[in-house]
């Protein structure tokens, strides 16, 4: 029994997949707390699709895909930030323009210059086929991003809560937003290998949304988000060995199940709890009359 449970760790590719998935899951979950706070969930989706031309360009130039994806994602994030602040357009309009433009360019490049990597690999991900060099890149990206987040989480929290107050205490909202979007681009680059461009939005939204139903204070929300992201990614990668299914799909399904369970049963803000409170309030009103 124990030998069966430990069998995945006897294979190098599974150990690498589990390790990378856990770190990337924690990083994406950390950022998801801020996306929930600001209501920027769709920006994560836009950036996930905006890295496609960068990946295509990197392969054409013989560069690591992470470099191209990071440059493309950073450019898309900068354009979204610039247009949101200077054009007067609503954020969702800007996201739609940037998302479709970058993804369209990526598909166009791939169609013109067939590559050894298929567009399906970019979109769906394949963590089990990760090479040692790719794993090292992702671990470096994830570790550096987590260190920066640990150092700057409080400043980012102030900016995301109230930019005016952030300026009065000497912080630069624009500079910190650039830092945040850079970290978001880095996390999406890392997550691409894990779940692909289509499912990465779940990793940067679902953990924060789940923790939102449980926590009242933002620091606790961050910690719980990271815990949810790391545990579900670890479990999903581990279970994929026995289920023989797509690792990314299993991870996202697990995160969705956890979200639905918390949404229904959270003691303070869950759906069932809210309905019971409404029913109790109605009874008090009836008894009062």
Locate the predicted segments by residue.
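Transmembrane helix-bundle core of multi-pass membrane transporters
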Residues: 2-16, 87, 91-154
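Structural signature of hydrophobic alpha-helical transmembrane segments
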Residues: 13-25, 63-75, 139-143, 189-203
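Loop-to-transmembrane alpha-helix initiation sites
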Residues: 17, 66-73, 92, 96, ...
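Short loop segments and helix-boundary regions at transmembrane helix junctions
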Residues: 33-115, 211-223, 242-243
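Small-residue-rich segments of transmembrane alpha-helices in multi-pass membrane proteins
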Residues: 50-60, 97-109, 129-130, 173-177, ...
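Membrane-helix/interface signature in polytopic inner-membrane proteins
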Residues: 147-180
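Transmembrane alpha-helical segments in multi-pass inner-membrane proteins
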Residues: 198-249
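Cytosolic-side transmembrane-helix boundaries in multi-pass membrane proteins
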Residues: 245-289
């Amino acid at each position: 029994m124990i030998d069966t449970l430990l069998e995945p760790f006897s294979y190098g590719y599974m150990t690498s997949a589990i390790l990378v998935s856990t770190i990337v899951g924690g990083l994406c979950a950390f950022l998801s707390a801020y996306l929930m706070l600001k209501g920027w969930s769709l920006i994560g989706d836009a950036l996930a699709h905006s890295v496609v031309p960068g990946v295509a360009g990197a392969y054409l130039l013989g560069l690591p895909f992470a470099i191209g994806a990071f440059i493309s994602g950073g450019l898309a994030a900068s354009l979204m930030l610039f247009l949101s602040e200077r054009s007067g357009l609503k954020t969702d309009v800007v996201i739609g323009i940037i998302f479709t433009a970058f993804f369209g360019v990526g598909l166009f490049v791939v169609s013109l210059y067939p590559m050894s990597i298929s567009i399906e690999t970019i979109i769906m991900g394949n963590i089990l086929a990760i090479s040692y060099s790719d794993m090292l890149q992702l671990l470096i990206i994830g570790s550096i991003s987590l260190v920066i987040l640990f150092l700057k989480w409080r400043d980012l929290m102030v900016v995301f809560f109230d930019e005016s107050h952030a300026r009065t205490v000497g912080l630069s909202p624009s500079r910190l937003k650039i830092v945040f979007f850079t970290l978001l681009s880095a996390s999406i680059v890392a997550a691409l290998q894990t779940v692909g461009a289509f499912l990465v939005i779940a990793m940067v939204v679902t953990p924060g949304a789940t923790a939102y139903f449980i926590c009242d204070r933002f620091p606790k929300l961050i910690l719980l988000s990271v815990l949810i992201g790391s545990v579900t990614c670890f479990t999903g990668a581990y279970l994929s060995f026995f289920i023989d299914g797509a690792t990314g799909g299993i991870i996202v399904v697990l995160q969705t199940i956890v979200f639905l369970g918390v949404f229904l049963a959270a003691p303070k803000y869950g759906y069932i709890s809210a309905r019971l409170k409404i029913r109790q309030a109605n009874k008090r009103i009836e008894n009062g009359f």
